[in-house]
Amino acid sequence: MERIYESKERFTELYRQHVRALSGKEFEDTSDIDRFTALANMIAGDARGISALTDERNREEGKKRVYYFSIEFLIGRLLDNYLLNLGIRDLVAEAIADMGGDLDEIERQEPDPALGNGGLGRLAACFLDSMAHEGIAGYGNGMRYRYGLFKQEIVNGRQVEVADEWLSKGYPWEVKRPDKAVRIGFGGHVVSRQEGDRSFYSVEGTDDVLAVPYDIPIVGYGGETVNKLRCWSAEPIDDHFDLDAFNAGDYTGADRDRANAEAISAILYPNDAGEHGRLLRLKQEYLFVAAGIRTLLDTFEREHGKAWSELPRFVAIHTNDTHPAMCGPELMRILMDEEGLTWDDAWEIVTNTVSYTNHTILPEALEKWPISTFSTLLPRVYQIIDEINRRWREGFDMSRPESAERLRATAILWDGEVRMANLSVICSHSVNGVAKIHSDILKASTLKDFAALKPEMFNNKTNGISHRRFFAEANPTYAKLVTEAIGDSWLDDARELEKLTAFEGDASFLQRVGESKRANKLRLAEYVKRECGLTIDPDTVFDVQVKRFHAYKRQLLNIMKVMDLYNRHLNDPNFKIQPTTFIFSGKAASSYTFAKEVIRLINGVADVINNDPRVNDIMKVCFIPNFRVSNAQLIYPAAEISEQISTAGKEASGTSNMKLMMNGALTLGTMDGANIEIVDLAGRENEAIFGLTTPEVDALRASGQYFAWDIVNSDRPRLGRIIDQLVDGTFAGLSGNFESIHHELMFNNDYDLVLKDFHSYVDAWETLTSTYPDARDWNRRALHNTAMSGWFSSDRTIREYRDEIWHA
C-alpha cells in the first residue's frame, strides 16, 4: 500500500502544525486529549480526501451503490483501526514516541461512539469495514444517537443506566452536512387528487422535523477505498426560540420545538412500554429510512436522471433486521407520489432493489406495531402498506386447504398489528439468515410459509467479523507472532491463517502462543484492577461470557455452574477444580427485569466468592461494567474459554464466538448458531460441546414431559442446593434474594432448559478445564482455532452478499 506520509519527519511536522492550530499550544504542553483531537482531525482529513477520490472513481466506473440500512452501527474507536488500515501505525507510534508522547495513551482518549449496542450493530460495522476493503461502493445509513443506549454502572450489584455522554468533548471523525438535510413529516392527513384515470396522494398538516446527516469516513484496509457511514440527527425545522415565553418564566416552553425534535435521536431503543416510547421508536425508524431513501434517490438522479427503471441496476438497498422495514413502502411513496410512477412500475423497482437480513428465530420476538399507532403517525406509508397487503392477499387461492393458514402467517396486517418481518419479506428479492442452522430454522419454522411460496428468495450468509479489528488491532502480540510465522498477507485475506496449522507440532512456537496469551491476560487484569478494583490472577483459566444479557443466552446457567463449584469445594475436601476466573460482561435492556436480575445474581455471587478466603485463591467472579467495543478488544485476546451456551435453536448466529475463536479461546457451547460451523471447521475434539440439540429441544417441548421440579428433586444435593440459595440469603448480602429467578425456573417451568442442560454443561466444563495443565496441547488447540477462524472474516461474508444478493 502507498503511505499517505512519506516519512516520519513529514508526519511530525504536519502533526505539530495540527496540534498548534487546534490547541494553541506546542505538543509538549498539551494533554493527551489535545493530542488525540489533533491526530484524529488530521487522519480524518486524510480519510475525507481519499473518500472524495473514492466517490469520483465510483462515478467514473458506474459502480453499483450498496446502501446498508441499520438502526445500529457499533463502530468502536476508529483511530487505531484507521492507522492500521492506512499502513501508518508504526510510523505514527514511533514519531509520537520521539516527541515524548505515547500513542496508546492518546488512543485511550477516544470515546466509544454510542451508535449501537450488541451484535446487530457490531455486525453492521464489520460489514462497512469489509465493503471498503473489497472496494464495494458501500454506504451505511443509520441514526446519530446523542446518548446511545445507556452507560451501564453497577451499584450494589444492580445495573444502573445513565446517559452515555459520548459527544461531550466533540467527535472529530464526523462532519455535519446541513446542506443534505431532509424534511420529514409525521402525522397529518392524506389528500388525493385526480389526474385522468390516476389518483395522486400527498399528506397535509404534518408535524415536521429536519433529519440532518453526519458523515463518518470508513477507511478500508490498504487505504484505497474510503466509504461513508451517514448517521441522521433530528432537529427542529425552524431554530425558533420563544423569547416571550422565556421572559414569562416558561423556560421549557421557550425551546419546546427543539426538545421535541431532538428527542427522536436522543437514545437508542427508547422504552416502548408506553405509547410515548412506541411513538418515539417508530419516529426513529421512519426518520432514518425516509432520509436515507430520499438521499439515495437524489444521488441516483444526479448521475442517471429520472431513469427510475434502472434503479435496481445501480442501487442495492439492504435492510439489517426489521427496523428499516419501511424502505420498501417509502420508496413506493416517493416513486408514485413524487415521481408519478404507476403502482406496478414502482413495485417492480422496489422488489428488485430491496433485500433483507433476518436476525430473529422466535416468532413472538418479530417486530410488530399497533395499526392505530402506525396509521396515525404515518398515514400515507400505512396506506401503501395496506395496499401491499391487499394485493398479497389477492394472490391466494382460498379454495386450497393450506391457503387460510398461509395467509394468516404471511399477511402484513393481522390482528390489529403491522408485522414488520412480513413487510420486509414481501418487499424484498432476497431474504437471508445469518448462520446455517438459523437459515434452516427460518425455512422450516419462523418463515416457513414464505419459504414454501418463494423458496428461491431464501439463502444463508453466515455472519463474519473484522479480523483486522478483533485480531490484528485487538491482539498485537499474537498478531505479530502470526505474521512472523506466515507473513502479513492474512491481513488482506484471512484464509491465509490456515497456514498456521503447520506450526501445531512446533513446541517452541506453541510456547510463544502461550506467552502471548499470558501477556493479554496481564493486560486485562490491569484493566480489571483499575476499573473494578478486583485483583485477578493471570495464571488462572480465564472463562469468558460477554454478550447482551438475555434468558436464552443463559448467563444464568453459567453463574449456577459457579455456585455449584463453590458449594462442592466447600462441602467436599476431595473436590478439586482448575483455578479459574469467571468473567462476565454485557448489558440488559433497561426494561428487561429478568436479565437485570441475572446481572444482580452474578454480582451477588461475586461478592461472596471474592471475599471468601477459603476459595478465592482458586475462584474469582468478575463482572466488567459497560461492555463496549474498546473493552471487548481487551477481553477477547485474554479469554481461554469461550462460553456460547444458548438454548439450542435460539441463537441466530452470534459473533462473540467467532472473535473469541480467532483469539485462541476454546468454545464451550451448545450446537447452536455459528457454534455448529465452528465445530465443523475446527473439529469437535478442539471444542467442548454439551447439551440438547435443536431437534431434542423441540421434541422435549412437544412432549409436554418437562417438569423443572422433577429435575431439581432428582438432584437435591447439587441442583436443589443452588435453587435454595436463590432465596435463603446465601448470596443476598449485596442486594437481597433472587425470588424472581427462583420463580422463573421453578414455577414458569424453566423455559430455557437451564436445569435440563445443567449437568451436561458442568461435566463438559470440568472435562475441558482438566486438560488445562497440559499447556502444549491447550496451546495447540488454541492455535488450531485461530488457524481455522479465517473463514469467519466478514470479508468472506461480504463477498457472498456482493455476488449472490447485491450483484455489485
Residue ranges and their predicted role:
Residues 1-808:
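A conserved ligand/cofactor-binding region detector
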